[in-house]
């Protein structure tokens, strides 16, 4: 501790007036540095921004090319030249043709100038604001250190040994404290002055920088990307409408052209047919005339010579020739008769035989149709008569049964009367008959009872099987329910463990995400300027691609029109060939149609008659079968109806008892299931209450941590908002 005492002694051995003198000297030196390195530079920056703003406002009405040249010559300083080069690259020049030359008509801005002429580049870095904004705090700290140093010197000189020394020491202490507070007051005063000057100069710099960027933005209108996008959309819509109109006009023109071609082709075909028919007729007549004339000319002279030779010949020769000619002619006529005459007679006979066969076939078909109609009528009449006969027989049988019953009743009455008259013998005979009747009735009742017992046993077996199956299914369902409850409780426990693990992971991820968000905010601010330039390049590239695509679409439309013209020409040639084929096939179809119409009529009548005959035959067979079943059923139903009704009543009572037992069983099952579900709901509610309580505690912790993180983010966002507001200002 001796070295510490020596240090304190060395520090407190200074005279008290040296403390405020030292503080004043340090503060004065800091103030002079502030004036030279901050205030004068701030005034220089303010004057420079004023000069630039006035110069920019002065060239507002000049030509765009002159404006660019003036600004290039204006921004020659290093801190402004780089920013101006970047801003100049973001400008978009619009050209128009004037006297065969492209000239700049206007220049559009794609990004605000404040993004390039930033506050940090033009104000903060030249003025060293990050250092000088902390200078008032440093001076205040120097004043406080001087105050404490003066107190240390005064306390070191304080001597409390005697009352006289105490009074003198108090005076010295107060004087030393006064010196110390004097230096502290000087330091605090100058720190206030420096703070005011620093904030005032910084605000002025920001103000004139904002005016400078506003004047620079006023030279160039923005929104070029939106205008190009709107014009692009407009041009694409116009091209789409033009393509649609072109398509509609092409379709209508092609339709009209095809109709005109078809009509003209039809007219030309008719005209060609008429001309061909007339030419064929004329050429035929001319050919016949030429052939007849040629034959006449060629045979006239030989015949004349023959006639002359015949006339000059002798009478005997003429007679011989005449006889020979007569013989030749008779032989020739006989030969013709034997050849062509027999053939014609045979043909006539064959035609007559064919006509006769056709007539006989026609009469046969007519007779067949008449017979089939007669058969169908006879079958309908026979079936109607049979039905009437069956109904009459049923009525007669019923009347006979009624008469038999009446006769039986009358016989019973007479037998009763005879019983009363005859006495014991008749009573014994009647008793035997009644015993026989009762025995027969008991036998029938036993058979029916056995049948009903078998039926009831089958029903009981089916009911027991159904009950056993339902009990097995319910037991299986209860077991599966228990397994599901066990798995559910296991899942709830796993869910609680997962929730706790997820909460810890969420807390850790939330802390990491807050740090990541703060780092990402800084990165996004840096990437903002880069994205603006990339968007400008992307917009220009998109415009170029759209122009190329529009040109390709127009070329495709031209090629499509050429293809449609070629298709129309091919269609015209095909129409010529089709019209020729239609004329050839029309004759064939007419002949085939005339031959098939007669056959279709005959076959349709034949098929209708056959179908009617089949339908009538099936209807008659069905009616006969139904009548047979009806007769059998009426005979059996009369005997078994009453007994069947009694058996049904007994069976219904037993089924009601079975239903009551099943209802009681289902009520017991519902009670057991209700209790099980209540226990399950209580267990689930208890586990959920515990889980939710733990979850609320963990969520409260997480919310407190999240609130702290959100406050930090809010502070960061507020600082970012201040920076952005300064940039906008």
Curated annotation (Swiss-Prot):
It is found in: Cell inner membrane. The keyword Protease does not apply. Its main location: membrane. Changing residue 184 to A: No longer resistant to SECphi27. Disruption phenotype: When this gene is missing the Zorya system does not confer resistance to SECphi27 in E.coli. It is a multi-pass membrane protein. One of its GO terms (biological process) is defense response to virus. Keywords: Antiviral defense, Cell inner membrane, Cell membrane, Membrane, Transmembrane, Transmembrane helix. The chain crosses the membrane at residues 20-40, 135-155, 177-197. GO terms for cellular component: plasma membrane. SUPFAM superfamilies: ARM repeat (SSF48371). Belongs to the MotA family. Component of antiviral defense system Zorya type I, composed of ZorA, ZorB, ZorC and ZorD. Expression of Zorya type I in E.coli (strain MG1655) confers 10,000-fold resistance to phage SECphi27, 100-fold resistance to lambda, and 10-fold resistance to T7. While most T7 infected Zorya-containing cells undergo abortive infection, a minority produce viable phage progeny. These eventually accumulate to a high multiplicity of infection, leading to culture collapse by 2 hours after initial infection. ZorA and ZorB probably assemble in the cell inner membrane and exert their effect there. This is Zorya protein ZorA.
């Amino acid at each position: 501790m001796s070295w510490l005492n020596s240090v304190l002694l060395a520090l407190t051995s200074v005279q008290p007036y040296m403390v405020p003198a030292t503080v004043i000297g340090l503060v004065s030196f800091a103030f002079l540095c502030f004036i030279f390195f901050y205030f004068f530079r701030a005034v220089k920056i303010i004057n420079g921004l004023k000069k630039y703003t006035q110069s920019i406002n002065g060239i507002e009405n000049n030509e765009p090319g002159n404006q660019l040249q003036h600004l290039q010559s204006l921004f020659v300083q290093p801190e402004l030249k780089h920013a101006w080069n970047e801003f100049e690259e973001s400008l978009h020049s619009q050209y128009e043709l004037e006297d065969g030359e492209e000239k700049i008509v206007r220049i559009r801005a794609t990004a605000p100038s404040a993004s390039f002429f930033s506050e940090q580049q033009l104000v903060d870095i030249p003025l060293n604001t990050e250092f000088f904004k902390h200078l008032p705090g440093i001076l205040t700290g120097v004043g406080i250190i001087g105050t404490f140093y003066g107190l240390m010197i005064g306390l070191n000189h304080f001597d409390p040994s005697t009352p006289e020394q105490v009074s003198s020491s108090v005076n010295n202490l107060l004087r030393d404290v006064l010196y110390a507070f004097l230096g502290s007051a000087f330091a605090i005063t100058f720190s206030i002055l420096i703070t005011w000057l620093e904030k005032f100069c910084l605000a002025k710099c920001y103000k004139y920088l904002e005016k400078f960027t506003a004047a620079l933005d006023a030279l160039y209108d923005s929104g070029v990307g939106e205008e190009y996008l709107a014009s692009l959309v407009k041009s694409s819509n116009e091209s789409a409408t033009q393509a649609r109109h072109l398509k509609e006009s092409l379709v209508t023109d092609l339709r009209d052209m095809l109709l005109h071609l078809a009509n003209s082709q039809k007219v030309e075909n008719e005209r060609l047919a008429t001309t061909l028919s007339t030419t064929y007729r004329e050429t035929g007549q001319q050919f016949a005339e030429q052939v007849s004339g040629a034959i006449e000319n060629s045979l006239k002279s030989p015949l004349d010579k023959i006639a002359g030779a015949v006339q000059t010949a002798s009478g005997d020769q003429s007679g011989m020739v005449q006889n020979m000619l007569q013989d030749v002619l008779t032989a020739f006529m006989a030969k013709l008769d034997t050849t062509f005459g027999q053939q014609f007679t045979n043909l006539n006979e064959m035609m007559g035989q064919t006509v006769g066969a056709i007539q006989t076939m026609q009469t046969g078909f007519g007779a067949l149709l008449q017979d089939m109609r007669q058969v169908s009528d006879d079958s309908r009449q026979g079936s109607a008569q049979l039905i009437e006969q069956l109904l009459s027989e049923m009525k007669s049988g019923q009347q006979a049964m009624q008469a038999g019953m009446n006769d039986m009743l009358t016989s019973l009455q007479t037998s009763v009367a005879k019983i009363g008259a005859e006495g014991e013998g008749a009573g014994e005979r009647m008793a035997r008959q009644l015993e026989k009747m009762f025995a027969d009735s008991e036998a029938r009742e036993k058979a029916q009872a056995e049948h009903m017992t078998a039926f009831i046993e089958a029903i009981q077996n089916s009911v027991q099987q159904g009950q056993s199956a339902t009990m097995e299914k319910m037991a299986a369902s209860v077991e599966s329910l228990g397994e599901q409850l066990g798995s559910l409780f296991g899942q709830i426990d796993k869910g609680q463990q997962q929730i706790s693990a997820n909460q810890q992971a969420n807390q850790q991820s939330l802390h990491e995400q807050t740090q990541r968000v703060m780092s990402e905010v800084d990165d996004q601010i840096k990437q903002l300027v880069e994205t603006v330039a990339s968007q400008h390049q992307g917009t220009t590239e998109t415009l170029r691609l759209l122009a190329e695509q529009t040109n390709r679409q127009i070329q495709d439309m031209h090629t499509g029109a050429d293809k449609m013209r070629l298709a129309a020409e091919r269609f015209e040639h095909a129409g010529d060939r089709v019209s020729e084929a239609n004329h050839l096939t029309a004759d064939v179809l007419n002949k085939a149609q005339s031959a098939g119409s007669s056959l279709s009529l005959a076959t349709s009548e034949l098929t209708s008659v056959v179908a009617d005959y089949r339908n009538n035959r099936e209807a008659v067979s069905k009616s006969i079968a139904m009548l047979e079943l009806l007769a059998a059923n009426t005979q059996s139903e009369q005997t078994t109806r009453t007994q069947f009704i009694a058996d049904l009543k007994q069976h219904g009572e037993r089924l009601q008892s079975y239903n009551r037992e099943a209802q009681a069983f289902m009520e017991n099952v519902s009670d057991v299931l209700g209790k099980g579900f209540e226990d399950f709901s209580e267990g689930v509610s208890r586990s959920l209450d515990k889980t939710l309580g733990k979850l609320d505690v963990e969520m409260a912790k997480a919310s407190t941590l999240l609130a702290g993180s959100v406050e930090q983010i809010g502070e960061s966002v507020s600082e970012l908002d201040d920076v952005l507001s300064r940039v906008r200002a």
